[in-house]
Amino acid sequence: MSNKFTMESPKHLVDDVLFISPTNDGSEEKPTEVTFQEDEGHDASLHNRSHDKKSELATEREIMATTTDDDGIPSPSHPMEKRVLRKMDIYLIPLMGMLYFLSNLDKSNIGNAEVAGLSKDIHLVGTQYNTCVTVFFATYVLFDPIGTNLLKIMGPPLMMSICLTCFGAISLGTAWVKNYAQLIVVRLLLGAFEGMIYPAINMYLSVCYRREQYALRFAFVFSAACLSSSFGGLIAYGCSKISGSLKDWQYIYIVEGCISLGFVPFYAFGLSKNLEDSWFFNKEEKEYISERYKTMNTFDPDEKFEWFQVWQAVKDVKTWASAVALFGIDLTTFGLTVFLPIIITSMGFTNVRAQLMTVPIYFLTAIVFFICAVWSDRIKLRSPFILGACLTTSIGIAIVLGSQVHGVRYFGVYILCMGIYVNAACNCLWLSGNTGNYFKRATALGINLFFGSGSGLVSGQIFVAKDKPRYIKGLSISLAFQVFSIFMTVVQIFLYKRENDKKKAIIDRCNELGEPIPYDERLSDKNPEFKYMY
């Protein structure tokens, strides 16, 4: 394994990849350029601060790993790695999946409540229902970036259990809203607490798993969104059979709110603030996890907040390209999640049957998602699955738009939904896996999800009642943005390929000159040996 070091920047520049090196007076570090002296007989000065640390890590890696992958980190085939992964898969993934399941259940139940008579009973008129759908995303967007940082400050048990308690109680309380104003208030509150869940789960899993282990595990979690939509339809159907003094939509909120509150103890007592302190690991495994962090390119448990990392994410064009792509993707996802029962009702099905007709759609979506996740991790690629999912969704939208036959339109909904979760999840995984330090990744994901969730503000206004039964405007806008997301995904491929080519040029030049490959821990994904995934 090659030695690594940081370099001062001489006058002749041959590359523009940013690194950090100490100032001449020994003051606080500042960003400089990694460069190589072109003049013969002149050697660039070496700074051994990172060299010593990386040499220690190299020794640790040799001790810990029986085999290594291309990045020089312990392979998943390492016996201890397998033990740790197995326990995380058994204990953490179900908890994260259930949390996301409950979040989506309470987020999208307004669609089922509407089919069950919500607007009629609380006297919503005109576009008031659409406004109630939309305002949820106003606070959801604002609290998205907060979730990633609160996770680090408060720790998973406290942060996640508080959010679950609050949005469960709010969902339960929604059963007793009497008018438009009250529904607006509870939707705003619900958006605030649910907005922190998805980014927190994403960041937590990126701390626990290596990026090549990430997609399949996240598929289990993200598919919970698909299953929650199916389960929500079943709950709505069951609530329609209850004979009581309350309305069907009230029972939907009561049942789903109580389910969420019932799971709070599992998060308050089942998680630990630090992964290595988890109750299900033995002493040997806890020690291994502490050492394992040192071989992960994307997490340092001792990392402290610094504005430098925030700025690194903000000025990275790849952050914004991913965010804009997610806006187009989520515009369809959020729109369909809330309005699908209404769209199916417009195809001629009764309200009760429409609730049931959503169940097999989301079940198939979950299966497709799992298949894509397995192959995405296996071939270590993200972009082909985003492109394929966007194309599939576009074809489905075109079928629903182009036909007036109810059976054909219902078939188009199946095609449409097979892609809406794959492209959204892979987009976030792609950015997360290609972003290094914790706070840089937290900022990048915050920006990404701010744009993605912001699309909910638009989706709530493009599927309006006056456009029934075909919703031509809403579906046409969704189709246009899917095509736009395909374009932005291609842009990201170009950007990552260009960065990888620059890094390869640096490595080749170092090898040619017999020099160690430069490294700085503060710029993890900017380092030459960090290869971006496509």
From Swiss-Prot:
The keyword Transcription does not apply. GO terms for cellular component: cell periphery; cortical endoplasmic reticulum; endoplasmic reticulum; fungal-type vacuole; membrane; mitochondrion; plasma membrane. GO terms for molecular function: carboxylic acid transmembrane transporter activity; transmembrane transporter activity. The chain crosses the membrane at residues 131-151, 153-173, 188-208, 218-238, 251-271, 324-344, 356-376, 385-405, 411-431, 445-465, 475-495. It is a multi-pass membrane protein. Coiled coil: none annotated. Keywords: Isopeptide bond, Membrane, Phosphoprotein, Transmembrane, Transmembrane helix, Transport, Ubl conjugation. There is a cross-link at K283 (Glycyl lysine isopeptide (Lys-Gly) (interchain with G-Cter in ubiquitin)). InterPro entries: MFS (IPR011701), MFS_trans_sf (IPR036259). Residues 152, 209-217, 272-323, 377-384, 432-444, 496-534 are cytoplasmic. Residues 21-56 are annotated as: Disordered. The modification Phosphoserine is found at S27. Its main location: membrane. Belongs to the major facilitator superfamily. Allantoate permease family. Involved in the uptake of nicotinic acid. This is High-affinity nicotinic acid transporter.
